[in-house]
C-alpha cells in the first residue's frame, strides 16, 4: 500500500480523473430545458499505473532482515513448473489478472520473482526509483519507467530474467527426470483435483475437482470408479476434504447452505449424503465448519471450525447431534487437513504458526496434544495412515513437495515419490495403495 501511494500521480486524494463531454439535441419545445442527450464521451485518466506483477512483487519483497514473507516452496513450484514446461507468463501477461486456474497466482509468483531479480541485479533502491518514475503525471508505461530508471527496457529485463529462470530450473530437474516416481495418473480433467479419499469397500475414490468450472476454488464432489473409469458428480460447491462412513454408503463434506440465515449470512457447514436414498442432511448450523472426519469407534465426526481468526477441532456426536470443542489454541494458528488414525485413535492435523506447516496429533483417548513432524526449516503436511499404522505425508525438505513414508513398526522411512512439480494430499488404503494430488504442468 505504501509503494502504491508513492506511485500515485496526484496523491491519495485524487485517485483518478475523467475527461467527459456531453452534448444534447436541440430543444423541440419552449417548455423543455434540454434536448435528448446524443453524445457522451468519457476518457479515464488513471492516477496509478502500476501493473499487478510489480505491485504484488514489491508487497512480497522483504527488505534486509525482514521476515514477514519469503519465497516458499509453493511459489517455487509454480514458477518452476511453468519454466520447465516453457510456459512462463510473458511480460504482457504478467501485467493483467483475469486468468483461469492458477493463472492469477502465477502473476503473483512471477511478479515476486521478477521484483526480487531486479532488486538483486540493480539494487533494492531501483524498486523505489521505478515507483517514483511511475508517479510522473505523463508516465503510464512500466516498460518505459524501467528504461528511465535502469537504462534497460522492462521487456529486456524480463527476457534476462526469463533466461536465468529457465536455465536454473531445467538444470535442477535433470536428476529427477532421470528417475521420476509418480505412479499412474487417473484423473486429469480440470486444473484442481484435490483431496482424494479411498472408498472403504470399493475400488474407487471420492475427490474434489473444479472441472467444468473456471476458477481454482470452484470445486464439486465426485466419485471415480477405478473398475469402470466412470466419473460421477455427487454434489456441487463442496469445500475441503470429504470423509467416508466406514460402510461406504455415506459420505461427509462441507459446503455453504443454499439459503442465508436470518442475518443474511451463509456459512460452511457439515453435510452427509446417503448413496442409497440419495438424500442430503445438514449436520451443523452456522458452524463455519469444514474438513469432516468420520470416527467409527465413537460414532462421531471430528471437524475444524473457524472462530476469531483461527481454527479449533470439534467433535460432533452423531447420536445426540451435539458438538464439543476439544482444542483451544489461544494464539490462533491456522489449522487444516484433519485426518483420523484408527491405529492410535487419534487425529492428525496441520498447524501453521509462521512460515511453515507442521503436523500435530490429538489423542481422542487421553486428550493430549503431541508434535509429530515439527521442523523449523521445512514444511510437513497432509498426514494419512492406515490400520497398520503406516504414515504418509508431504514434505518439502528437498525444495520440492514429495510424499514421505514412515513406518513406526520397524522405524523405516523414506520418500515414495520423485516429482518435478509437487505431491500432496495422500490417502492410503488398507491394502497399501496410495492416491494423491499431483501438481504438474499446471
Regions found by a protein language model. Give the residues of each.
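Blade-terminus and WD-like Trp-Asp/Gly-His loop motifs, strongest in beta-propeller folds
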Residues: 196-204, 242-250, 292-300, 338-346, ...
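Short loop/turn segments that connect beta-strands within beta-propeller blades
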Residues: 225-229, 274-278, 317-321, 363-367, ...
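A short beta-strand motif characteristic of beta-propeller blades
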Residues: 181-187, 229-235, 279-284, 322-328, ...
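Beta/coil-rich, acidic/histidine-enriched accessory regions frequently appended to metallopeptidases
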Residues: 100-105, 130-249, 272-275
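A flexible loop/linker signature enriched in serine peptidases of the S9 family
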Residues: 69-72, 189-191, 209-220, 235-240, ...
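Acidic/His/Gly-enriched intrinsically disordered linker/tail segments
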Residues: 3-121, 134-173, 177-179
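Ordered, small/hydrophobic-rich secondary-structure cores
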Residues: 66-138, 205, 215-216, 228, ...
